[in-house]
Regions:
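Iron-sulfur-associated redox domains of electron-transfer enzymes in respiratory
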Residues: 1-169
């Protein structure tokens, strides 16, 4: 019996429609389980960061979303380190997508806008604590601007036949 390929799926900053498109090809996924194992996918499997830390190697990582926070960056770096192949899935991962439009505005305008519209209202802040939120990066980046990417599957979301071809490759 040949060893099953380990597949990871991760979504950074984006709308998660690319992940939904992957999940929507369920009628083909049953054949996938004969030769592949979904080893990390927070959206579908409820995987935690500790699950990723325990894995020695991943054969293929499908990374969706743009890099907008320090946690997005950390995930991209860790998944690249563990993955034999890194695939930028969708327009956000491939090009920055809609989240990347924020790069068109001066950063001070975006900072002021965020500070004005995000009044303190969390339970943590009511207790005098700071919420543990990821830090926003100065600019939104596409995946290839952070790590080496082996393949790009663009689209918003990518077409299902392209998704299935990428999975089978």
């Amino acid at each position: 019996v040949p060893k099953k390929k380990k597949i990871a799926v991760y979504s950074a900053t984006g709308c998660r429609v690319c992940e939904q498109a992957l999940a929507d090809i369920h009628y083909q996924v049953s054949s996938l389980t004969r030769w592949a194992e979904l080893s990390f996918w927070p959206y579908l499997l409820g995987s935690q960061w500790s699950d990723l830390e325990r894995q020695a190697e991943i054969d293929v990582c499908f990374f969706t979303g743009a890099i907008k926070t320090d946690s997005d960056r950390q995930a991209a770096l860790k998944l690249r380190e563990k993955s034999r192949l890194m695939i930028a899935l969708g327009a956000c991962a491939a090009f920055g997508g809609l989240p990347g439009l924020v790069n068109l505005a001066p950063s001070e305008v975006m900072k002021e806008s965020g500070e004005e519209t995000n009044a303190p209202n969390s339970r943590a802040q009511e207790k005098g604590e700071e919420p543990d939120l990821p830090q926003i990066e100065e600019r939104v980046s596409a995946l290839h601007q952070i790590v080496e990417v082996d393949y790009f599957v663009p689209g918003c979301p990518p077409r299902q036949n392209f998704l299935w071809a990428a999975i089978q490759a």
